[in-house]
Regions:
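ABC ATP-binding cassette signature C-motif
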Residues: 1-169
Length: 169
């Protein structure tokens, strides 16, 4: 599903509440015992700026360096690029690292906050391919109509005090 609406209506706050990072205004949030959440943060604050790209990946799933380098190649990182510190990466490169980590996480529910922001065309294509091949549930906050049209089976349109649900593609 895609959660859409104007800035400031609470889309990102909703995701953070579902994650347990923020308390609900009322009631409680219950997540099923078998649900494993993967989260793509809009500002990529879940990346350690001091780690290299390869370190970020192997902390999610231990693997041999050659295997990690091969995996990172599918996210457009090649050669010695894999040893670059996160703090030196562009916003789009950080987005690709965050997406690579999600792909390895074993999550069956992805909460994605503006995942196509700061991504170039090649990175947007990788994002769409990874998400299209994902076997679990995706809740996507986005203003990217192309991504929403490609992936969302439902559209949740938020406005102040109101949520409407529509069929997607």
């Amino acid at each position: 599903a895609a959660l859409i609406g104007p800035n400031g209506v609470g889309k990102s706050t909703f995701l953070k509440t579902a994650l347990g990072d923020l308390p609900p205004l009322s009631g409680e949030v219950k997540i099923g015992a078998s649900v494993k959440i993967g989260y793509f943060a809009q500002a990529h604050e879940l990346l350690n700026p001091n780690n290299s790209i390869i370190d970020e990946i192997t902390r999610v799933k231990p693997m041999l360096p050659a295997e990690a380098r091969n995996f990172l190649g599918s996210f457009l990182f090649s050669g010695d690029d894999v040893f670059r510190p996160i703090e030196t990466l562009s916003g789009g490169e950080r987005g690709r690292v965050a997406l690579a980590k999600l792909a390895l996480s074993g999550a069956n529910l992805l909460l994605l906050d503006e995942p196509s922001n700061h991504l170039d065309i090649d990175s947007q294509e990788i994002l769409q391919n990874v998400l299209a091949g994902f076997g679990g549930t995706i809740l996507l906050v986005s203003h990217d109509r192309y991504l929403i049209d490609a992936l969302a089976t439902q559209i949740w349109a938020a406005s102040p005090g109101k949520l409407e649900v529509f069929e997607g593609t």
